[in-house]
Amino acid sequence: MPQQSPTPTLRERRKLATRADLVESTLQIVREDGAEAVSVERIARESGMARATLYAHFPDGRDAIVRAAYAELGEQLVTNTEAGIDAAKDWRAQLLAVADAMIELAAQPHLGYFYNVAGPALIPDGEGRGGGSGASIRIITEVLQEAMAAGQVASGTDAVATATLLVGSLRSVGIAVASDAGAAPAMRAAFVRLCAGLRS
């Protein structure tokens, strides 16, 4: 029987809540004015917390909290993707749900640019980097494997390699839509055509 994780203490819960509030304040600044507007002073002002509190949770200051905000966006993307997968009726709709989650995020002013363009440049590695892509590869791989087992996707398809290529294309979709939200319909249609080639 697996061991249950110990229940967090009140102090630990408060610490997590404070950290979450700081990250959300950072994301709100990005939503309003873009990543370049994020500073320790503004985060402290927006969150109503002292600079010392911010540094207690993020000793590296702005860089650390920007990484945490980027990681949080990646987690939100995965959550939205999984919700779309659960609501989809077949494998093609499931793959499209992955694309739609990315397009929805990318189309948000400032936030989409932060996740797809500015963030990766600011965060070459470390916390949050690649989390959304890794989860998307896993999700698409599972979708393809199930579709292959049902005879709906061509046998012999390398699910992992195909998932990796599809996620790579979605990164390009995210960059394009973040730069021009008007590109979303054409990008979505192109992804649908790309996935259609996988049918058995």
Task: Name the predicted role of every residue range.
Residues E104-D125:
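Amphipathic alpha-helical segments used for helix-helix packing
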